[in-house]
Every structure is written in C-alpha cells, then in structure tokens.
Amino acid sequence: MISRRLLATLFSLVLLFPAVRAASAARTAYVIIDAQTGFVLEQVDARDKRQVGSLTKVATAMVVLDWSEKRGGDLNQFATIPPEAFVGTGENLIGFQPGDRITLRDLLYAALVQSDNVAAYTLANQVGVALQPVVPTAGNGSPVAIFVGQMNFLAKSLRMERTRFVNPHGIDTGERSMPFSTAADLARLSRYAMNKPAFRFYVSQKERQISFERGQQKKAYMLRNTNELLGANGVDGVKTGKTARAGDCLILSAHREAEIQKQGEHTKVNPRNLIIVMLGSANRFTEGGQLLARGWQLYDQWAAGGRMIDPKKTL
C-alpha cells in the first residue's frame, strides 16, 4: 500500500511540473543590440512570435512620419476623430469624443507618449485617406486597412519577416495568434525609428501638453509618458506596451557619452547606444533596468574586444 508520505510527494510533483512548464512558456523574450551597428549583444527567444501590444504604435508613427517626410504631409493639419476610433480601444484617459478636431502632430504625441489607442486609430484613418490615391494596392480598402497595409510594407522593407500587423494600436483581436512580432523584428524597427530625429524627439518627452477642439471649445490635456525608466541611466526612449495576451512589453533606447579614440593623426568617435526589446515580461521596468545594466556590461566587453561584428549576429 502506498504510504501517505509518498502520496503527498507525488501530489506535490504533479503540482510543480505544470507550474514549471507555465513559467518556462511565459519567460521574457528579449534582445539587446548595439544601436549603431545592429550587432546582437544578447538574446533570449528573440525570434519567437509574440503579441506585442502598443509597441505596434512605433510602426504606426513611422508610417505617418515617413508619409510626412517623403510626400510632404502636413503634421499640423487637423483630423476629426471618427466614431470607429472608440470601438474596442479600451480606456479613453484623454477624454476624446467623436467629432473632436486635433492636429496630426498632437495625435502622434498622444499615441507615443501616453500610448493612446484612439489617437493611433485616428492617425491611421486620416493618413490612410491621403494614401488611397498613391498606394497601388489600395483598391477599395478602408483608409485604416490601407494604412495597416503600409505598416506591413514597412515591416517587410526592414526584414521583419516574422511580423504581422492587423491594426494601428496593437489591441488583441478575435484571432488569438494575431497580431504578432518578435523581439528581433522590433529591434530592427526601433533602430530605423530612432535614426529619425522627429521620432526621437517624440519618444523623449516625459510630459507634453496637447490641445484639441470640441465645437467652439478648445481643450487641453497634459500627457505623461508611460515609460517609467525614461530619463534615468541614459534612457531616452522608446515605448511601452501591454495587453492581456501580450503581457508587459517594453522597448528601451539608452545612450552613454561617445567614446573618442585617437588613431595617429585621426580621431574616431564611437557612439554608445543600446536598444533593448522585451516581450512578455512579468515586471517590465524592474527587468528593463536589469537588462540595461547587463547590456552595458556586454557592450563594454564587446568594445574592449575591438567591436568585432559577426554578420550572422547582426540585425
């Protein structure tokens, strides 16, 4: 006959193993790269397809900024917030209402600084209308669908081969596997975005006051950045994300003073910048701080070894 002690031991093991599997399945996927070269300093599950929540808005912002830069789109033009922007978008902390009028510039601040979903949808709707005549594959698609198509076109151009966007804000959809990306793909996107001065400025703001019109009234709102690490230990961007399926997600950009090397009569300046992408973290800001410290340690070791770059380890 099995003793009570043995039964208790077996029961505890049954409880333990599922917990171990769950913890393993839910571990943070991350990548740490040198922002200058794209060299990967460390990665864990960086090619795993994950849902990424509001990190999606980095792609949303870049489609808008690229449209403005390449096609002369005016970021000071006003957009009218459509009723559809409130469907399934969750919180409305700014207090937008259908029919409110706001500039694209302030919508970008709202989407990037405070991660506002209504703002992201309105950007896609407004710029999608402008893209309809110039996108060959637009067909009869809605403005938002055309815009999301451009988000995926951008992803393809950046070799984000394991990414699929389905909306401009990253909210969970009815299909559990969509949208998705990877830590490595989002590092590629972040390198691209952080090379744009306008984007860098948006995501560097701890606070920003925006204004919008409601009929004859002018409303003001003070945005506060959702990135709690911004401004500490050289962190100068980028974006937070969180949904029920994505968990806590975070992209960090950080810098240190450039390293200056004398080489005979010449001087070489080595910028020191990191990008860290974390998906599915249990505590993104605590873990983000730890990975940042780890990243600089790895960077210093890599720099001391001559900054050798293996193309197979470069994004």
Model region roles, listed by residue range:
Residues A25-A29, G99, N125-L315:
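Penicillin-recognizing serine hydrolase domain
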Residues A22-A184, M194-P197:
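Active-site-adjacent loops and short helices of periplasmic peptidoglycan-processing enzymes
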Residues A8-P18:
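Bacterial N-terminal signal peptides
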Residues M1-R5:
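Positively charged n-region of N-terminal signal peptides that target proteins for export
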Residues L16-F17, E69, Y299:
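Hydrophobic alpha-helical membrane context
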